[in-house]
Design a protein with these regions (language model features):
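Acidic/histidine-rich catalytic cores and adjacent linkers
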Residues: 14, 23-49, 57-60, 79-225
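Glycine-rich phosphate-binding "P-loop"
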Residues: 1-11
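Residues at the C-termini of beta-strands that transition into short coil/loop
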Residues: 5, 56-57
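Glycine-rich, anion-gripping cofactor-binding loops and their flanking helix/strand elements
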Residues: 11-19
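A generic short-segment signal for beta-strand/edge and adjacent turn/coil regions
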Residues: 1-2, 20-23
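Short alpha-helix plus adjacent loop in nuclease-associated cores
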Residues: 59-80
Length: 225
């Protein structure tokens, strides 16, 4: 943790970049970031040679949100017909099946094999995870083309919208194959920061909040000289 700013804006991100020296900026080879346009724009000026890498965990989140949108719409349609097939299944579609217990595995196996729209959306999400395993850009591009074509023909609007978004940013997905960086560390720090905030029952001002975050998350050298 190098520094903290109070807002999630481009100006705030520019402020963070300004804390780095020219020498430090020259060492930046790649930046992991989500697809929020202001964040992308703020990277281009201070480190124009750095690759932008869209965080794969955010991509999974976008795809998961599409699955949930499909589920909610289909559940509404089924309930109108008196069909409760999808009642109580929300978490099954969002969690990793590898982490299911025996009962959850049995329940999910039964529902995912039905002819459901949400099952197709879920399959699209799971299939895309293979993208990150490719070693070469050419094979990854071929995979994406096939995956995009399949989703485009699925008639699942939320999934199609995410697929189109990923296609627009494909260049910054492919950079992951070169750098293999994510925001996993940042997400871990966010959890720690929320714990600090909860333990303090809030902070009177941002200055105190920032000091506490940097003290506990900044890897300070506290050994005496």
């Amino acid at each position: 943790m190098l520094d903290v700013v109070p807002e999630r804006t481009r100006a705030a991100a520019d402020q963070l970049w300004a804390t780095l020296t020219p020498e430090q900026k020259q060492t930046v080879e790649a930046v992991a970031v989500d697809m929020w346009e202001p964040f992308i724009r703020t990277i281009e000026k201070p480190v124009p040679e750095a690759d932008i890498v869209h965080d794969k965990f955010h991509i999974s989140k976008y795809l998961g949100e599409a699955v949930d949108q499909v589920r909610r719409q289909e559940h509404k349609e089924l309930m109108a017909q008196g069909d409760e097939t999808l009642t109580g299944t929300r978490q099954l579609w969002l969690y990793n099946p590898e982490n299911f217990g025996p009962e959850q595995s049995k329940e999910f196996s039964a529902v995912k094999d039905l002819e459901l729209k949400v099952a197709r959306a879920w399959a699209a999400k799971e299939l895309f995870s293979k993208f990150w395993n490719y070693q070469g850009e050419g094979w990854a591009r071929r995979f994406f083309k096939d995956w995009f074509g399949w989703v485009s023909r699925s008639r699942l609007k939320p999934a199609i919208a995410v697929a189109q978004r990923l296609k627009r940013h494909l260049a910054n997905l492919l950079t992951y194959l070169k750098h293999h960086i994510t925001n996993a560390v940042t997400e871990g720090l966010n959890s720690k920061i929320q714990s600090l905030k909860a333990a303090a029952r809030g902070f009177r001002n941002f200055r105190n909040y920032r000091i506490r975050i940097l003290f506990f998350c900044g890897k300070l050298n506290l050994y005496p000289l």
